[in-house]
Regions:
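Conserved PLP-binding catalytic core of the aspartate aminotransferase-like
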Residues: 49-80
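PLP-dependent enzyme catalytic core of the Aspartate aminotransferase-like
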Residues: 76, 90-129
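Hydrophobic, small-residue-rich alpha-helical packing segments that form membrane-like cores
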Residues: 64, 71, 80, 87, ...
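Flexible glycine/proline-rich, aromatic-decorated loop/lid segments
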Residues: 3-12, 33, 74-93
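Membrane-embedded transmembrane-helix bundle of lipid-linked glycan/lipid transferases
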Residues: 28, 32, 36, 85-88, ...
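Flexible loop/turn segments at secondary-structure boundaries
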Residues: 20, 24-27, 36-38, 60-62, ...
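Active-site C-terminal subdomain of aminotransferase-like
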Residues: 1-48, 52-55
């Protein structure tokens, strides 16, 4: 079936990738992901109306709380070509206005700055509206 073929292709790709980067390379990729995630969170919580939901160790994802509904913020970011994260409110009603964000080793400091700048603009304009 297609599902089995797709699984086989993904396993093959992952095996090739891990064999190329090796244990040391995989550790470096993980460390870079953690670093980029920390940089992303630091940049985003500096935006007025954004705060960290949980002050716990994390790998490459974090939950942020916004002072307004996440859906509108994500729509405004999407209009700027930015996939801003995942609105958690539908799956976790107790986390209203919660946004799941992620950064990996593939994100650059410029990507993070662009996201933070766009989020700051969206939050400021939404407050003025």
């Amino acid at each position: 079936s297609n599902i089995c073929t797709n699984q086989g292709l993904l396993v093959t790709a992952a095996t090739i990738y891990m064999s190329i980067v090796g244990p040391r390379g995989l550790a470096q990729v993980a460390a870079a992901s953690m670093q980029r995630s920390a940089e992303l969170v630091e940049a985003l919580v500096a935006v007025p109306g954004v705060r960290l939901a949980f002050d716990r160790p994390r790998f490459h994802e974090a939950v942020l709380l916004l002072d307004r509904p996440v859906r509108g913020v994500l729509e405004a970011l999407a209009a700027r070509g930015i996939i801003g994260g995942c609105d958690l409110s539908a799956d976790y009603p107790a986390l209203a206005n919660a946004l799941l964000v992620c950064a990996t080793e593939t994100r650059t400091p410029a990507d993070i700055a662009a996201y933070a700048g766009a989020l700051a603009d969206v939050m400021k304009n939404a407050a003025a509206a």
